């Protein structure tokens, strides 16, 4: 940042490192005061900021009960007469649907977070309860209807924000051209710190930022930077580096301790 920390953007996995970094700037004797500190995001906040850049209309975050109510409506709309799903729904009410709605909401949120569009899972009878088998048999259709219903209702979830952002970036980077950074990141040094394993949507977003010059800081075995052969516990990070075909540089001296 050439002595201008306010020109940096730092992205953390959660809020705790941000609090520590703020305290570091506040009390460090070697930091001149007053100064502008870096703009800091958690991964979730960054996804929401990208979503807001892509879609200016504000959307309310759906809580768990909102998600379940919306899913109940979607499932009932999809339950055609004489299908297993329709017959199972006929045997239950909203209270009976609720525990299945919780599981279904969690499953679809995980699909959103990983950037996956599931298909119908057939022939699960005997493996799960009959109602669960009926839901899984229509999983792909439920996912697509739920996705559309969130948009129609001006609702979102953290996973859906990530799904929309990653989908737009994948579409924009399909060719050779790299979409420009949004205004709130343009011209800033971008640092990604504290991540170990990436979800599918994080991988899409962070790789886009990395191609724009973002630096990634990993707290791992120094051997990954020295010879690429790190401790087995760093397998995920090693695969990450290999997948991106990224160069590595040791950011600070090795402590000299060998991992067990």
Identify the meaning behind each predicted range.
Residues 1-260:
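Nucleic acid-machinery interaction/catalytic patches
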């Amino acid at each position: 940042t050439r002595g201008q920390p306010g020109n940096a953007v730092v992205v953390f996995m959660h809020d705790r490192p941000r609090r520590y970094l703020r305290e570091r700037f506040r009390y460090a004797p070697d930091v001149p005061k007053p100064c502008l500190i870096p703009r800091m995001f958690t991964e979730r906040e960054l996804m929401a900021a990208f979503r807001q850049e892509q879609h200016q209309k504000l959307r309310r975050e759906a809580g768990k009960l909102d998600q379940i109510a919306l899913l109940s409506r979607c499932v009932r709309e999809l339950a055609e007469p004489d299908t297993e799903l329709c017959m199972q729904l006929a045997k239950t009410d909203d209270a009976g649907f609720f525990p299945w709605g919780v599981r279904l909401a969690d499953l679809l949120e995980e699909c959103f977070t990983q950037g996956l569009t599931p298909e119908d899972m057939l022939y699960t009878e005997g493996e799960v309860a009959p109602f669960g088998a009926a839901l899984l048999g229509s999983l792909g259709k439920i996912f697509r209807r739920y996705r559309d219903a969130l948009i129609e209702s001006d609702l979102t979830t953290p996973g859906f924000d990530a799904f929309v952002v990653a989908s737009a970036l994948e579409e924009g980077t399909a060719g050779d051209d790299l979409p420009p950074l949004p205004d709130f990141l343009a011209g800033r040094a971008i640092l990604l710190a504290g991540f170990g394993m990436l979800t599918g949507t994080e991988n899409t977003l962070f790789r886009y930022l990395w191609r724009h010059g973002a630096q990634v800081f990993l707290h791992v075995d120094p051997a990954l930077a020295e010879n690429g052969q790190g401790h087995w516990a760093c397998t995920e990070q090693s695969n990450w580096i290999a997948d991106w075909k990224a160069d590595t540089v040791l950011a600070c001296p090795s402590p000299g301790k060998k991992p067990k």
